[in-house]
Amino acid sequence: NKSHNWYENDINYGIFIILHQFLSALSSYIGVPADAVRRDYYIVQMMQNLQNSEYAEVCVFKGGTSLSKCYPGSINRFSEDIDLTFIPVEDMTNKKYSKALKRVEDTISAGFLMEKIEDERNDRNKSAFVWPENESKETCRVKLEIGSSVRPDPV
């Protein structure tokens, strides 16, 4: 039974401490708050979850985060959210679409804690806050938005 708790394994705890020290040093060096640097690191981890999944080809990465990650230097900011448009390969009923979005959401947030934003969720759109269990939700949460009701093109 595999646990996601960093503190149950001395090696993982050591890696966690080294990572925090590195990200804190990077934060000081570039003059960006440590929470922003850590959140940006976790966004990259979440996007790696997507990239390594069967959903990589049916999700369009868009918005400011996509510009900062895919076109370095295009905008100078650290990210707080992940915006995706899901483009299914076949027509789907609302129920099937909702289930597919939930699977994408679960894939991206694997290894993280998640809190659904209920008033922003329906069959065609899912929103949630995602953060690592060893971090504060208030300082390291990432807003994950997956949907279909907006243009898939980066804006």
Where do the PLM segments sit?
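Compositionally biased terminal segments of proteins
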Residues: 1-155
